[in-house]
Amino acid sequence: MQTDTQPMSHPLIQESSQVDLDVLEAIQQRILWLAVRMVDSANNDRTADEVKVGGHQASSASLVSVMTVLWFAHIGGSDKVAVKPHASPVYHAIKYLTGELDRSYLTRLRSFGGLQAYPSRTKDPDVADFSTGSMGLGVVAPLFAAAARRYVDAHGGPTSQEPARFIALAGDAELDEGNIWEAVTDPSLQGLGNVTWVIDTNRQSLDRVVPDQKIKKLIEFFRGAGWHVVEAKYGSLLQGEFDRPGGDILRHHIDEMPNEQYQSLFGLEGPALRARFLEHAPDGLAEFIAAWSDDQLGRTVRNLGGHDLGLLIDSFRECDSVTDRPSVVFAYTVKGWGLPIAGDPLNHAAFLTAKQIGELRSVAGLSTDTEWDRFDPATPEGRLCSAVGSNINNRPLAPRPTLPIPTSAGQAVPGKPTSSQEAFGRILTRLASIPEVGNRIVTTSPDVSVSTNLGGWINKVGVFHPDEQPDYLSDGRLLRWKQTRAGQHIELGISEMNLFMMLHALGLAHELHDEHVLPIGTVYDPFVCRGLDALIYALYNDARFVIAGTPAGVTLAPEGGAHQSSITPSIGLELPGLDYVEPAFAQPLDWLLCDGLRRLAEPDGSSLYLRLSTRPIDQTPFADCAEATDMERLRQDVLAGGYRLREPDGAPAEVVLATCGPVTPEVLGAADILADEGLASVVLDLTSPSRLYRDWRVSLRSASREARTAHPTFHLARLLPHHERGLPIVTVHDAASHHLAWLGAVFGARTVPVGVDEFGQSGTIADLYESFDLTSGQIANAALVAVS
């Protein structure tokens, strides 16, 4: 059996306008077998552990047909696909058949160093285009990747690249996730005609059958958002019966049948199946199907479009023909298709028995000696697998380019009190003028660009829009909101999840689009938590970007507790792949931002989290420190995580005051008070607590692994000479007090942590600092407690 396809949708079809569905059927059956057997092997062929290995045979089976058509009759090498998490065995089976995955991995699903439970960009040997596993995020990742590709293309990206399509495979229950709808409705993501989502509509979630009206509502949601909707609902066998005289009765009955009733048909045979199917049936339906045998009835009523290969090819072709908006295909499938557990409401975590595995092996035409074999290369199936592999399998990726990023943007040290947020905006504007750097920077913000000091940058580079827009409101305004294809700022709606997903997409532009950009996002600091799942997802994928959380802390006094962050520094310190910095002064911020942009391209680099403030701070203390210190040494200390801002005056220090961010003036004031009391102190400005901590932790881990004494080669040991390492420490931070409390453990010193351990409220900075013991007098008292 053959069907027409689009000539340019697949490597083999470039020479032929036909796809042999019999070959696809054979490949589909082998993929089903391998996916199911991989899960079976993981749970039964290894030494038993205390924890169940798990896996999803039924969820994999429901997408076998869709993925067979996509990989073997639709996508090409430039296309990117996000695989439904629970279908990861299907993905690995495809990568094995096409030659990318070594056979040894098939028995290492969910094992250390083997195949991950869910598709992973960073952990799997057959690198996935998008990691999936955190529900909802993998679904929208291709949508944001398409937006990033649109941006790259508009800014002179590689002209040799073929056009790319971005596809997501999602379960129908996954559409419960709210971040999906935040993305679907965002104006910046409209008009992406190279995006297709395929919804695995098997009507089952983890615990239950999906309620009846849900799918209809979802379809209307997509249509209301301007998406093109395709329903691959009924297979050709069932469609043929609908076309017979009286077939409209059959269609109406199935359309109106409750999901629970329809799902129950998969567990019934013979007269019981017929009786259940005819419950609440309209007049005439019993006569319409009277001539059907029980077997024919079962084959017909279970014939859904999500398992009809020809219909799926046509559905994807239709999506390709719509180029002015995204498309979504609702592929009606059977959870557990082709397996004895098909349609069982409790099949999500069910495993086939050894007897059932043996029967499935026989259906696949295999034996225990051949069960892991690929197709013979000389067969039509083998030739197709080879051709697909040569076109779509991953190739080595060139490293990110080294850019001429300076150590400083050349921002003059302000002569007046300046906030770190204000300095950030000025530094960014100066970076725009640096060749090969400014043109690669792209900023994005969830409708807070002006209030996070991106106004100067936007005036200089403009706002990105795929089609130039008229500007009716800029006359006489300080902010010029000019929207063109050349703009370098992407404005999002008020969604922090979308912000981090956009940063994720831009931060992988080199890997996905062969173009390295420098993404910088801004967000109100307390709402870093609101987008935390997407932030973690981006870092897990090794996306590289800069995020500025500003304004931060109770220093944002008038805004009240809802806008005053306290735990975000802990997030910055504890997340892998993220360097958290909180400079108090403008020059260290300049150094840190330039260094952070440089690290985005390094193989072992990281993303950068700037925690900033709107509080103007006198820059004189840093200028005095710089005058008394070698400037390059000072810069290196700042980048390493901290420097000695003030030395004890005359007498040896008796206490260490460690701080960062906007409370630094209060700490310096406390040092003055202590000096008047005859107590000398050293003040450390910790520009990056996360770098300090990790440096110390690496030293300890290395020593513990080698069973030796840890040598004090970490940066904090360089900041505190031997005679100061046992001194009491007072840590002061506009954040949760525990965030810096670990400092005392480094050298076994008595520690008094001062910080924000309750929710704030509206007031002045003086009010809030008094409330949280952040005034100079209270900090001095804490130092007296520490030394007492």
Identify the function of each model-found stretch.
Residues S16-L24, N43-G54, G76-D79, D124-T132, ...:
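Glycine- and acidic
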Residues V19-I31, A35-R46, S59-Q190, P211, ...:
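Cofactor-binding active-site loop characterized by glycine-rich and histidine/acidic residues
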Residues Q28-W33, D79-K80, T379, R383-A543, ...:
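Non-catalytic terminal/interface segments that mediate subunit docking, oligomerization
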Residues S78-D79, R150-S160, L508-F527, F545, ...:
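Glycine-rich phosphate/pyrophosphate-binding loops
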Residues P85-V90, A170-E177, D200-S205, G235-L237, ...:
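Acidic, glycine-rich active-site loops and adjacent beta-strand->loop/helix elements
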Residues S111-A128, L137, Y151, H155, ...:
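Thiamine diphosphate
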Residues A168-L169, W197, T444, I547, ...:
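Residue-level marker for buried hydrophobic side chains located in beta-strands
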